Amino acid sequence: MTNNSQIKVIVGMSGGVDSSVSAYLLQQQGYQVEGLFMKNWEEDDSDEYCSAATDLADAQAVCDKLGIKLHTVNFAAEYWDNVFELFLAEYKAGRTPNPDILCNKEIKFKAFLEFAAEDLGADYIATGHYVRRDDSTGHPRLLRGLDNNKDQSYFLYTLSSEQIAQSLFPVGDLEKPQVRAIAEQLGLATAKKKDSTGICFIGERKFTEFLGRYLPAQPGVIETVDGKVIGEHQGLMYHTLGQRKGLGIGGLKDGDENPWYVVDKDVARNVLIVAQGHDHPRLFSDGLIAKQLDWVDRQVRREPFDCVVKTRYRQQDIPCHVEPLDDDTIKVTFASPQAAVTPGQSAVFYLGEECLGGGIIEQRFSGSV
């Protein structure tokens, strides 16, 4: 058995059950374990929105129970500069970004990794993500988590082999019910705490209200695919492709009663374009163009290849053909048309269990490009 007693691991403690159990499992494996709670957002409103104080208290309670030290660090400035401003710029441009992916890239596996190594003397960091690391080839690879329902590799595709080499993912080999069972057996404060669903580090506040504070809303009209004005929107940023609820339009006189879906955004005209029916052709794409590529092995792809892709979290794998257009642009053609492919979101590629990397969806296409 490996002697881990001289190896120091700093666990990112979020105040949730996954990071709590991660710390315990590493302790059981003999590592020197300490926790780190990251504060990445300055509270600017009432406690009902912001759970940071509760999360910190929960993280502290778990560390006390396990007998490990908890450090705290404030990355609010880094979060604002490297995550939030880009997040706002993307929304302003009419796209729908994924801040959790950016947060993992810039905060958890960059700012945290550097702070843990340089200030706390860590050999590794660890998080409660449901992914696995494979070292069998000599270059650390990122694998999907064992629990298919909880696999979070989609959110970690920007990591390099080098970052993975410095990271441990203790719950990646477990299923969520097992993790909760361990927490309950230990009597951890986080055992029954529900999973967070809010934007990374900003909590579960009302999103439209939150976004409206930072970006002035620009109301405009809602048009059908035929150009008929049928309503008004409060701002393109509040809508995403494939959205059905919250449009404020019902059936039209002399029209069918099928629900309306967002099928496009005309940013130049500030017009939201809708169509009726979940199978309307305008909802579907034959493929996409992606840029800002991050391959885990950091090797530029120059030859076409086949694999599977996800264009959003928890989506079924889509067989596809990937054709590099230049070093930072790829054309992806789906085996069958896909609904609601959304610019600003990430396309993430897999070969079997391995996450190869991904990129940001620049545009979607139908027919040939």
Curated annotation (Swiss-Prot):
UniProt: ATP binding residues: 12-19, 38, 128
Keyword terms: ATP-binding, Cytoplasm, Disulfide bond, Nucleotide-binding, RNA-binding, Transferase, tRNA processing, tRNA-binding
Region (Interaction with tRNA): 150-152, 312-313
Keyword Disulfide bond assigned: yes
EC id: 2.8.1.13
Keyword set includes Plastid: no
Reaction catalyzed: S-sulfanyl-L-cysteinyl-[protein] + uridine(34) in tRNA + AH2 + ATP = 2-thiouridine(34) in tRNA + L-cysteinyl-[protein] + A + AMP + diphosphate + H(+)
Location, primary (coarse class): cytoplasm
Site (Interaction with tRNA): 129, 345
Subcellular location field: Cytoplasm
Domain of life: Bacteria
Stored Gene3D superfamilies: Adenine nucleotide alpha hydrolases-like domains (2.30.30.280), HUPs (3.40.50.620), Translation factors (2.40.30.10)
Disulfide bonds: 103-200
GO CC terms: cytoplasm
Interaction with target base in tRNA, as annotated region: 98-100
InterPro entries, A to Z: MnmA-like, MnmA-like_C, MnmA-like_central, MnmA-like_central_sf, Rossmann-like_a/b/a_fold
Any one Gene Ontology BP term: tRNA wobble position uridine thiolation
Residues at the catalytic site: 103, 200
Role noted for this protein: Catalyzes the 2-thiolation of uridine at the wobble position (U34) of tRNA, leading to the formation of s(2)U34.
Family statement drawn from the similarity comment of this UniProt entry: Belongs to the MnmA/TRMU family.
Protein's name according to its UniProt entry: tRNA-specific 2-thiouridylase MnmA
Annotated source species: Tolumonas auensis (strain DSM 9187 / NBRC 110442 / TA 4)
